[in-house]
Amino acid sequence: MAKFEGLQWASQQLRYMLIEKKGELLASDAKIPAVSRSTNYAIFLCFEGIRFFCKNAAGGGLELHFLNWHKNLERFRRGMAFNLGRDQQGLVPAVSDLESLFIDSYFKAPAMRPFLEEMAGMGAQGYLRPFTVDEEQSIGVTFPNLPSIHAMACRYDQYLGEPFCGVVIPHMVRALGVNKTGWLKLGINYLMSVKAIDEAKRITPDAAAALFLDDQTVRPIEEREITEWDSSCCLFALKDGTVVKIPESPLILPSVTIQGMAIILKGMGVKVEERPFTYGELLRRVKAGELVAAASVGTAGILNRCQKLVLVDNDLKIVATHAPDEGHPLFATLRRAREFYWDIYREKAAPPEGMTLYRYAL
């Protein structure tokens, strides 16, 4: 499975108790109860991944940059709401409250300064990990009694990276549409992600990513729709110059990054189609040489192009293998779109219409 490389955590984490509405800084290795609803049943266990950039500002100050992060915060709110009972919905903070909590109570804390100064000096990629947990020591299968938000920042060198090998895994599904869990960043979804990677390695040992189909397993495999990679969304670049983006649905995490990538590609003159993409169409286009590249798109890695995509049948027998058409203009365009996205954070490129760069002076 994709992993972070060159990871360095901040020395402090934030904890905010939702009932008491009280926040505090804790050491990065602070513990929660070993026995709880969250650790045993994954109840009230949701999270977010939010990219950020920290730069040196005039007068010796620092400035934090986030791109479209209110969408991350709204998605985090939806995950919390899903994990709480009807009578607990009032505990879910507003987007503006989450923004203030993370900026004012965490990033502006004096204890965070050395970490952020080091980041700014390196020009490193930053990643904020907010997550929720029930702080009560309990084994009862109920909604949380002591719900809290934690947040911790890190810097890193890269995530997934190129080249990587992906494998279609048709006999497992990441989430069920009827449960409406696939569009949320929930801990329960990611066990299936790592299990799918384990299955992919049985097919080809160099597998680093698994590509899921939809949950309609009774349909012929060719009629099933592609959903997403194990921990990221996907784009397909076609030889006719079109890029296909899978529509958002209860099976697919609404990626802030892929929404931005679609805007950037359109600004570069690329035709972006948002439509279902069946496995049968993928098979046909691979065999006809009509697929330029399959790409993984997500917060940490931004966009990585798959170097080898292995397609299988219902019996997990390999029926086709795709290698990207590196000579096609779209292959290089995808790389430029990735660089443009990161350049917005660093103020080397202006955000296009539909994308907002948030700046915070520290």
Where are these regions (language model features)?
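Conserved alpha/beta cores of soluble small-molecule-handling proteins
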Residues: 1-211, 215-222, 263-362
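Extended, low-hydrophobicity, polar/charged segments
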Residues: 69, 250-251
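Glycine- and Gly-Pro-enriched alpha-helical subdomains that act as flexible
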Residues: 217-250
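Short, charged/polar low-complexity linear motifs in solvent-exposed/disordered segments
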Residues: 244-245, 262-264
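Accessory, usually C-terminal, subdomains that scaffold auxiliary metal cofactors
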Residues: 251-254, 284-285
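Feature captures the catalytic cores and cofactor-binding loops of soluble hydro-lyases/lyases
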Residues: 255-260
